[in-house]
Design a protein with these regions (language model features):
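Low-complexity, polar-biased intrinsically disordered regions enriched in Pro/Ser/Thr/Gly
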Residues: 177-183, 297-307, 535-552
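Short alpha-helix boundary/capping motifs
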Residues: 32, 67-69, 98-99, 412, ...
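Basic- and hydrophobic-enriched, low-structure N-terminal and domain-boundary segments
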Residues: 1-205, 209, 214, 541-542, ...
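P-loop NTPase motor domains
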Residues: 22, 32, 36, 142-147, ...
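Hydrophobic alpha-helical segments involved in membrane association or supramolecular assembly
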Residues: 70-76, 435, 439, 510, ...
Length: 663
């Protein structure tokens, strides 16, 4: 090292010597006046000039000086300094070159020779010093800046799936991902949608636009029967309807399109979710009651099993099952159940007790009634009446008492596309009724030998989906694909309870996540696992710089990255099949949507059709009258049921004792 330093010092001395020679030769007359010329030097320089022509131009000695200066700087190891930048080096070097090489004209200025010489020597020296500084700074510059990748992007980028893997069930989304300092094209291949899918993301992250809409379109193209819960009706419904019109060729049997919409009965089919033909056991009535009551009282989800939670559920279940067995289920509708519940409880209990299959079911109520525990009884009944009273609506009664279609949407002989619309302004009312449709559909479609089907629930926490965890766990073998969209896991835990929320999180095979924060981001980061990453550290002291490189396991996609995803950027993982292996299941990419194509398609969309025309022969709109007449008819039918049943019980010697005499 010392030998190298001596060589570099020698080269720098030679460089300075050439500068001195340049000044001596081209400023000779002035130097002679100053008395600093020497005859020996003059002879040596004249000999060089005769043999080499070294001084034929002012540039040659300058070039030799710069060459030796550069060599001396290259071989010099300076103390590294973070504050030295290429910008400073470039500025110093540029100034040095200008001052050092472009100053020959100063010798020709119309000034005294002494002045010309002073200016020339000053600029030459300043230029040389600037170039010397630039060269020295180069040797002290940190060649590898550890702060070039402050967000660790290179370490956390990885190769993703670039193959398009399709089958008759798959959903395939084109992507762009960053890897090895460039953007690459790839694919997210959901080759097994029957293992359920989750789409997470804060509002505006693009989960509906990039994922949910694509699921709807591709599954319709591939002939799926479809059930879609449309929280912001008719956004998803219009997509499903128009895409079906353009892709009917994907179905062996042409499917029918059905709508449930409580806001506008003109654009809604009618369907009875507790149709007697689909209720074979009192357990079905209990499931329906359970779904309704927990949708109306979300706080009960975490209190399942409590006395004042189970009591109203059992009471409503008994009423539903009574309507199922009364006259063959002629009046078995949810509006009839609400109206019957709101009759005098003495009459209701008397009627229900007259049926042996309901007598034991109602024993808690009957015990309280017969022991005159009025406060307890009133509390039990009020727990059922008060929430259900919010659902008393002529429009809701109209939709839920008809039978335009059945809920077995994946019946191979009658496939259906069913969309149900909610309204954020009336969510608390509509969610309970729609939850009933959900629970009935889940039970009817999750069977062997049916058509492949899809259940798409966007904004899942706005509705309580009874049996969802069981559907995810068992639907795969029955070809039922489930897609759930919501904002984050904390929202799901709040509305579904901790236990059910964890089951849903841990049993879903395909996960898409846009921007999410907090615990959800941490959970997802842990799910994606860790990868071996390279770490580089640098130590700088007065004498030298040392660099060490190590590896360690770190998060493939940290929670901080998930918390700051741009709109349209998603992280996630997919599940594969035995015969369709996907080595890299995890993705961190932008889901590519052809915006121009979407705009063109949307521009051609037609509005959802009008289902029922309430116009009479004279052209008058009779919707309100017909809906009100249906409402009044239901109430009258329930009054008549109570009267007929009480009369029957009074006239039956074996049952007349059930009628409690009023004091």
């Amino acid at each position: 090292m010392r030998g190298l330093a001596r060589v570099m010092d020698f080269m720098r001395a030679v460089s300075i010597l050439f500068v001195g020679i340049n000044v001596y030769w081209f400023c000779y007359s002035t130097l002679k006046e100053w008395g600093v010329t020497f005859e020996v030097i003059d002879k040596i320089l004249w000999n060089f000039q005769r043999t080499t022509g070294l001084f034929s131009s002012v540039l040659w000695t300058k070039l030799f000086s710069v060459v030796f200066l550069a060599l001396s700087c290259i071989g010099t190891k300076g103390v590294k300094e973070e504050k030295i930048t290429w910008a400073k080096i470039h500025c110093s070097l540029a100034a040095g070159v200008v001052l050092f090489f472009l100053n020959w004209w100063l010798l020709e200025l119309p000034l005294p020779h002494t002045a010309d010489t002073v200016f020339y020597i000053a600029t030459l020296s300043a230029g040389y010093i600037c170039m010397l500084m630039a060269g020295t700074w180069m040797s002290r510059l940190l060649k590898n800046n550890l702060m070039d990748d402050v967000f660790n992007t290179e370490n956390e980028s990885f190769q993703q799936e670039t193959r398009l893997i399709e089958n008759e069930y798959s959903v395939n989304l084109p992507t762009r991902f960053y890897y090895k300092k460039k953007w690459n094209n790839g694919w997210i291949n959901v080759v097994n949608p029957f293992r359920a899918s989750l789409v997470l993301g804060t509002p505006g992250s693009g989960k509906s636009y990039a994922v949910v809409n694509s699921y709807i379109k591709q599954q319709i193209e591939k002939g799926f029967a479809l059930y879609c819960y449309d929280y912001k009706f008719p956004d998803l419904s219009e997509i499903a309807y128009n895409h079906l019109l353009n892709h009917l060729d994907g179905y062996k049997v042409k499917p029918k399109f059905y709508i449930i919409n409580f806001d506008d009965p003109r654009k809604s089919h009618r369907c009875n979710p507790i149709n007697a033909s689909f209720m074979s056991d009192i357990a079905d009535a209990y499931e329906a009651s359970y779904t309704i009551m927990l949708n109306l009282n979300r706080s009960w989800i975490s209190k399942q099993g409590d006395f004042f939670v189970e009591s109203p559920i059992i009471l409503l279940a008994a009423i539903i099952w009574y309507l199922r067995i009364y006259q063959g289920g002629k009046y078995c509708t949810f509006p009839h159940a609400i109206e019957l519940l709101n009759k005098k409880y003495a009459d209701v209990f008397t009627i229900l007790r007259s049926y042996p299959e309901l007598e034991n079911y109602l024993s808690p109520f009957v015990d309280a009634w017969e022991s005159d525990a009025q406060e307890q009884l009133q509390g039990q009944i009020a727990s059922a009446k008060i929430p259900l009273s919010r659902m008393i609506s002529p429009a809701l009664y109209w939709v839920m008492t008809g039978d335009d279609f059945s809920l077995d949407i994946n019946n191979p002989k009658e496939p259906k596309i069913l969309v149900v619309g909610n309204n954020p302004d009336r969510q608390n009312i509509y969610s309970a009724a729609l939850g009933l449709y959900n629970s009935r559909i889940v039970k009817l479609i999750n069977k062997k030998g049916q058509l492949k089907s899809s259940v798409i629930i966007d904004e899942l926490p706005t509705i309580y989906f009874r049996g969802l965890d069981n559907l995810i766990a068992t639907a795969r073998s029955n070809k039922v694909a489930v897609l759930l969209g919501f904002q984050d896991y904390s929202q799901l835990t709040r509305d579904y309870g901790d236990k059910e929320s964890r089951v849903i999180q841990n049993t879903v095979g395909n996960v898409f996540s846009g921007q999410v924060v907090g615990e959800t981001a941490k959970i997802l980061s842990e799910r994606f696992g860790k990868v071996l990453q390279k770490r580089q550290s640098m130590t700088i002291n007065q004498r030298e710089k040392s660099t060490s490189i190590s590896t360690q396991m770190d998060s493939l996609i940290p929670a901080s990255k998930i918390s700051n995803l741009m709109q349209g950027m998603f992280v996630g993982a997919v599940a594969d099949n035995f015969d369709e292996r996907i080595e890299q299941k995890i993705f961190h990419c932008e889901i590519v949507v052809d915006n121009e194509k979407v705009k063109r398609e949307t521009a051609r969309y037609v509005k959802l059709p009008q289902i029922i025309d309430f116009t009479d022969k004279d052209g008058n709109d009779r919707m309100q009258e017909e809906i009100q007449a249906n409402y009044d008819r239901i109430r009258q039918e329930v009054r008549q049921i109570v009267e007929d049943e009480i009369t029957r019980i009074k006239n039956d010697p074996e049952l007349c004792h059930l009628i409690k005499e009023e004091e």
